[in-house]
Amino acid sequence: MMSAMKTEFLCVLLLCGAVFTSPSQETYRRLRRGARSYKVTCRDGKTQMTYRQHDSWLRPLLRGNQVEHCWCDGGRAQCHSVPVRSCSEPWCFNGGTCRQALYSSDFVCQCPEGFMGKLCEIDATATCYKDQGVAYRGTWSTAESGAECANWNSSGLAMKPYSGRRPNAIRLGLGNHNYCRNPDQDSKPWCYVFKAGKYISEFCSTPACAKVAEEDGDCYTGNGLAYRGTRSHTKSGASCLPWNSVFLTSKIYTAWKSNAPALGLGKHNHCRNPDGDAQPWCHVWKDRQLTWEYCDVPQCVTCGLRQYKRPQFRIKGGLFADITSHPWQAAIFVKNRRSPGERFLCGGILISSCWVLSAAHCFQERYPPHHLKVFLGRTYRLVPGEEEQTFEVEKYIIHKEFDDDTYDNDIALLHLKSDSLTCARESASVRTICLPDASLQLPDWTECELSGYGKHESSSPFFSERLKEAHVRLYPSSRCTSQHLFNRTVTNNMLCAGDTRSGGDHTNLHDACQGDSGGPLVCMKDNHMTLVGIISWGLGCGRKDVPGVYTKVTNYLDWIRDNTRP
């Protein structure tokens, strides 16, 4: 009898795996604020999803062809590994791999890069919404007030008309997440936020996609998964076949597919990206055979867009900030000469996938390029970010006429090293800044922003441990002269900006400081943050009526283009 019990127990272990709890990855949350009732929930640290008591779910393991089966029990997620097989139906979107538990109907989707969610239905690369945002499936989660959106699966939304537990939630973009959506075809994406003891709906601060200078403004964002435009020609000029063409009966993606409407397929020949490819495409009849080609659809302008989070902590010289508020900010490090490791050198600005702008004076010691390293997506100067991207430097270019005495022509370019034609991948934490038009002239005293990891004040012994932002105003050229800067040389390649607040305590005026060099001075233009200056030099930090001096970017657009051509 004992032997039989042991055998049965061993069999259970082999089939199901050992059950365990992981309190470090799951959070026991007690939602007890205002009118909300006491609820026990579990938060899955791997997927960042929340579950109610007795809910169960699957999550993929990093190793092997197995997944974990988990359930919420008393605020803790209990999990064990289970064997899986390929799903009988293709439940996953965007090329996700479907795995079904061997002894149940539960399944899990292993998503390709750039997608997430239970069914890989969330496009992590989408940075803005088109039209009303009904098809928006990005990851923006901040309301216009700055409040964080509530999870659509929250128990407090059970009686709301739109929640993640609706039968058609997936089709509406709702689910176990807190990302902005527009399920009711309102004027723009929105979400629920908790205010004054109750959940209310509020429009999101998600940026609208800019119209490109095309005849019809038709463009795609990310990889074009949500593209629902009307373009119907490929890059070679071929006309697309209708998705219900008789020639496509043997193809996977057609107007007859069960989820065709959700994929944008139908009785038309408009370009689409139903399989999560690199960009919109279509079927074409070419050279007497059926094939497919990428479409001639331009990509929407996404530079200068951000998920701005209102700073919560005021410090000397500025405000602590999150990298998603300044996703073009780069941190440049250099190898130590006499000891292992590397040290922070300067700030930088991402202007394209493989190019970073900075200040020439940062590289006066002519470091070998392989001694430099560029970090993108980092909120804390010395702590890796969740979506951080790291690059070695292939080469850097200092302006030939840089004057190390006056800091005239204080501009440099760093070329990031990559094995492919692209380097930085766009995300909420990493994005390019818009370069200005050569004719850009902003009004005097326009409020702009700068960011960096520099010192809080000139007497500080250390650089800031966290990214900071500062709000300054553009000085008129008549106030940006040697006379106003203690006879220091000021050239036409420079501009001035500073904190113009008056009265009260002036010891906390916003300004750049040592360590911020090479970072961005950006201003809003046509709903996009646009690079106006590069942090160059100043007389002290945060002194009343003494502006900081910046490299005037409009004077170097030709130089930038000439040096970044392939």
From Swiss-Prot:
Role: Converts the abundant, but inactive, zymogen plasminogen to plasmin by hydrolyzing a single Arg-Val bond in plasminogen. By controlling plasmin-mediated proteolysis, it plays an important role in tissue remodeling and degradation, in cell migration and many other physiopathological events. During oocyte activation, plays a role in cortical granule reaction in the zona reaction, which contributes to the block to polyspermy.
Residue ranges that the Swiss-Prot or TrEMBL entry lists as coiled coil: none
Its EC number(s): 3.4.21.68
Enzyme class: hydrolase
Boundaries of every Kringle domain copy: 128-209, 219-300
UniProt site positions, description: Important for binding to LRP1: 103
Glycosylation sites: 153, 487
Further comment: Binds to the kringle structure of the fibrin A chain. Binding to fibrin enhances its catalytic activity.
All copies of domain EGF-like, residue ranges: 83-121
Assembly notes: Heterodimer of chain A and chain B held by a disulfide bond. Binds to fibrin with high affinity. This interaction leads to an increase in the catalytic efficiency of the enzyme due to an increase in affinity for plasminogen. Similarly, binding to heparin increases the activation of plasminogen. Binds to annexin A2, cytokeratin-8, fibronectin and laminin. Binds to mannose receptor and the low-density lipoprotein receptor-related protein (LRP1); these proteins are involved in TPA clearance. Binds LRP1B; binding is followed by internalization and degradation. Forms heterodimer with SERPINA5.
Site (Important for single-chain activity): 468, 516
Domain Fibronectin type-I, first and last residues per copy: 40-82
UniProt cross-references to SUPFAM superfamilies, sorted A to Z: FnI-like domain (SSF57603), Kringle-like (SSF57440), Trypsin-like serine proteases (SSF50494)
Activity modulation notes: Inhibited by SERPINA5. Inhibited by SERPINE1.
Organism: Bos taurus (Bovine)
Keyword Metal-binding carried by entry: no
Gene: PLAT
Keyword annotations: Cleavage on pair of basic residues, Disulfide bond, EGF-like domain, Glycoprotein, Hydrolase, Kringle, Plasminogen activation, Protease, Repeat, Secreted, Serine protease, Signal, Zymogen
Record: active site: 361 (charge relay system), 410 (charge relay system), 517 (charge relay system)
Important for binding to annexin A2: annotated span: 43-53
Subcellular location: Secreted, Extracellular space
Name of protein: Tissue-type plasminogen activator
Family named by the database record: Belongs to the peptidase S1 family.
Gene3D superfamilies, per database record: Complement Module, domain 1, Laminin, Plasminogen Kringle 4, Trypsin-like serine proteases
